[in-house]
A protein has these predicted regions:
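Hydrophobic transmembrane alpha-helices and their helix-loop junctions in integral membrane proteins
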Residues: 2-51, 57-336
Length: 336
């Protein structure tokens, strides 16, 4: 959050220079970081929920930043409303945890979790509610529809929301609750299925997009599906590992896209771009590194995290050859 977020702030200083709402933009951006840190550093589900709602509000403000643009306002409202559906699931999960354990503090909940047998109804219910929350925030089927429209915000916002912070909050929440999810085979299988289907669907949609930012948006949805699938097959650590590596190369790709758009006077259609390497060599090489990383080229971070996910999808405690096959296909589609 702080590492990639700081780099995006530095980039945004130059990118937003001369914009009429310069100070408003950085107010929203820093408020977003504040709530994201609360979400990550809190020691209870209560604090996580405060941060969770805060980043939802800030994403609405940032996506709809261009107040004179109707499509931006509509995209902001769409993101806010769809996320409220997921938030309802999350808060129901928190209530279920509270009534089951008498506390929402992580340590107290996880210490008492072993008292319940595997497949206990209350644990399964809480985990399925958490999955609904994660589907909203991390853009999983069927609540993924808000993420591509979130491209209406300034490019640094796209980088921050899609790479470093907000959309990975759902994956973080599932991984943080791994003690509970591990006690519910139904929830684990559900998580893996939702993640696998999202990864496959988003990767196929990305293939037919012309808008450079929408390609990256659907690519993000696909990679989030990868992370969720990793958690579903029992590879929580590997899912978080891919979350971290993805934050860096996806932020790089979004900032590279912003650089290209800036040079081409906000042109988004990739078919109208060509020979940009000649005029923007630095952007070309950095973008190429980002593409190679997300494609899983050996030697780069994406290769190691994806390789581990595929291994667990095949041989993990909740793994299945179908998950491995979907993961392999999605890796190929992403590389293409």
């Amino acid at each position: 959050v702080t590492g990639v977020g700081s780099l995006i702030h530095i980039y945004a200083v130059g990118y937003m220079r001369g914009d009429a709402g310069y100070y408003r933009f950085f107010t929203y951006l820093n408020l977003f970081m504040f709530f994201m840190l609360i979400l990550v550093l809190g020691n209870s589900y209560g604090l996580m929920f405060i941060g969770w709602e805060g980043v939802g509000l800030c994403s609405y403000l940032l996506i709809g930043y261009y107040i004179g643009k109707r499509s931006a306002g509509d995209a902001g409202k769409k993101a806010f409303i769809v996320n409220r559906i997921g938030d309802l699931g999350f808060i129901l999960g928190i209530f279920t945890v509270f009534f089951t354990f008498g506390s929402v503090q992580y340590l107290e909940v996880f210490e008492r979790a072993h008292e319940f047998e595997i497949g206990a109804g209350a644990i399964t219910a809480a985990c399925l509610f958490f999955l609904i929350g994660a589907a909203g925030k991390s853009a999983q089927i069927p609540l993924f529809v808000w993420l591509p429209d979130a491209m209406e915000g300034p490019t640094p916002v796209s980088a921050l929301i899609h790479a470093a912070t907000m959309v990975t909050a759902g994956v973080y929440m599932i991984a943080r609750s791994s003690v509970l999810f591990s006690l519910s085979p139904i929830a684990m299988t559900s998580v893996a299925i939702v993640g696998a289907l999202t990864a496959l669907m988003a990767a196929t949609i990305a293939l037919v997009q012309n808008d450079i930012k929408r390609v990256l948006a659907y690519s993000t949805v696909s990679q989030l599906g990868y992370m969720v699938m990793a958690c579903g097959v029992g590879a929580f650590t590997v899912g978080v590992s891919h979350l971290v590596t993805h934050a860096f190369f996806k932020a790089l790709l979004f900032l590279g896209a912003g650089s290209v758009m800036h040079a081409l006077h906000d042109e988004l259609d990739m078919w109208k771009m060509g020979n940009v390497k000649k005029y923007m060599p630095t952007t070309h090489w950095t973008f190429l590194v980002g593409c190679m990383a997300i494609a899983g080229i050996p030697g780069l971070s994406g290769f190691f995290s994806k390789d581990e996910i595929l291994w667990y999808a095949w041989s993990g405690p909740y793994g299945h050859p179908v998950f491995w096959a979907i993961g392999t296909l999605v890796a190929g589609l992403t590389a293409f």
